[in-house]
A protein has these predicted regions:
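Soluble catalytic domains of membrane acyltransferases
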Residues: 54-148
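A transmembrane-helix-recognition feature enriched in membrane-embedded lipid enzymes
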Residues: 1-60, 112-113
């Protein structure tokens, strides 16, 4: 039953997202950092958190006070499934950009939100491209973005 509810919510989320892509695109023309921040807030508060709630997931975070809030950091999430990604993202501070495998960059709506949130896509089969991706991480870190 929960699967059906989550699927229905994802459909509703996709419908609501369509006009927001345009709105956030326009915002990004004037302030790219504002677009990234608002995109992260929307995806987190109206995407990931409700999906976790509807799925019956309850998170308990210990040591949140140890998470850096005002300086750049690199977080590495060791995840085995998609829910680990949702749980990790909802606990990360803003602004946070993520590194994801390049295959996720081919999923239409997901890749758009990830690009809006300054996420990077990593080709795990090409070592040179992977090193190039990691060298681009330096730029967001110098702008006080968190990287996960």
């Amino acid at each position: 039953m929960r699967s059906i509810i989550v699927a229905f919510y994802l459909l509703l989320y996709a419908i609501v997202s369509l006009p927001l892509f345009l709105i956030f695109y326009i915002i990004g023309k004037f302030s790219p950092s504002k677009k990234a921040y608002l995109s992260q807030k929307f995806v987190n508060n109206f995407g990931f958190r409700p999906i976790l709630f509807l799925s019956g997931v309850r998170l308990t975070v210990k040591g949140r006070e140890n998470i850096l809030q005002d300086q750049a950091a690199l977080y590495v999430f060791n995840h085995r499934g998609f829910y680990d990604i949702l749980a990790g993202y909802t606990t990360a501070p803003y602004p946070t950009a993520f590194v994801s495998k390049k295959e996720i960059g081919k999923v239409p709506m997901v890749s758009r939100w990830m690009k809006y949130m300054n996420c990077l896509f990593l080709d795990r089969s090409d070592i040179r491209q992977g090193l190039q991706t990691f060298s681009t991480i330096i730029v967001p870190l110098t702008n006080n973005f968190m990287i996960s």
